[in-house]
Regions:
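C-terminal active-site "lid" helix and adjoining low-complexity regulatory extension at the edge
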Residues: 112-123, 127-134, 143-181
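Hydrophobic residue at the +6 position relative to the catalytic HRD Asp in the kinase catalytic loop
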Residues: 139-141
Length: 181
């Protein structure tokens, strides 16, 4: 199986506070934004701070994913389309880059390159997608300094086209075949 950081999904502020005793990231589940009081917030994956931990009452109305922070040197963006697996490695040159590197996409601070996958890794992805009964998914992994791959999440509607096109991966052609056999 995959290495998975400790994770919980909760809308209980007390449970969330207890979980956040170690470096933790916070992810919205339903959408990347929420309303709290009279303000509207847009939230990428964010490292939990003392201020956020002290103000967790907003999660009562919308569960969140809390996940142990992985000190990463790269991210893997896996695009699964109808049995085919495309893997792009994303790195950044920004010192102290945000936990979520998506805002850096399309800038000179974010680089993508094809990542050579082992047959075992591809088989694990295919097995997971079969078990989840998904024909498409964008799957995120973090790579730590020891080279360990940490499974972060499966996005059944995640971003994929921009970076796969950028580095010459034929994911769009695979999607076309999937949708118009």
């Amino acid at each position: 199986g995959f290495c998975v950081p400790d994770s919980i999904i909760t809308n209980d502020p007390e449970e969330a506070k207890l979980f956040c005793q170690a470096p933790t990231v916070f992810k919205m589940l339903a959408k990347q934004s929420f309303e709290y009081g009279d303000k509207f917030y847009s939230v990428d994956t964010t490292l939990m701070t003392d201020e956020l931990i002290a103000n967790l009452s907003f999660i009562r109305s919308q569960p969140i994913l809390l996940q142990r922070c992985v000190e990463k040197i790269a991210e893997l963006r896996v695009t699964y389309v109808g049995g085919e697996v495309f893997v792009a490695k994303q790195t950044t040159s920004v010192e102290g880059a945000p936990v979520d590197w998506r805002p850096l996409q399309g800038t000179q601070d974010s680089m993508y390159e094809p990542w050579d996958t082992s047959p075992g890794f591809v088989a694990q992805i295919q097995s997971l997608m079969k078990r989840l009964n998904l024909k498409f998914a964008a799957i995120d992994f973090a790579v730590d300094s020891d080279g360990v791959l940490w499974f972060l999440e499966v996005n059944p509607n995640g971003q994929w086209l921009g970076y796969t096109d950028e580095i010459g991966m034929p994911a769009a052609a695979s999607m076309t075949r999937l949708l118009a056999p």
